Regions:
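Conserved, structured core segments of small domains
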Residues: 1-96
Length: 96
């Protein structure tokens, strides 16, 4: 299932990670490990935020994805199911 992983990084931990060089490495490793379809980086609510779209095969993947981000960045995470336009076209008729 296509998922959106939303990663919000607290300012203090983000600043530390930028200074010690670990922020880019951790985000690159996460995007690579997930074989992300797309990844975007924004500021939201004054915080660094990553939006990573990927295919989740099994919900058992969640701890392996989340723990490095929790431990390394004290990040707040959201896993959200996501659709593209084709998925929406396919799903809408079933809702009628």
């Amino acid at each position: 299932m296509r998922m959106l992983l939303k990663v919000k990084i607290p300012t203090e931990q983000g600043n530390r990670a930028v200074k010690d060089g670990s922020l880019g490495k951790m985000l690159e490793a996460t995007v690579g490990k997930l074989k992300a379809e797309a990844a975007y980086f924004i500021a939201e609510d004054g915080l660094r935020c990553a939006l990573i779209f990927f295919d989740m095969k099994d919900s058992a993947q969640m701890p392996a994805i989340a723990e490095p981000l929790f431990i390394g960045l004290d990040a707040k995470l959201e896993f959200l199911p996501a659709m593209n336009a084709d998925d929406l076209r396919k799903g809408l008729p079933a809702s009628m």
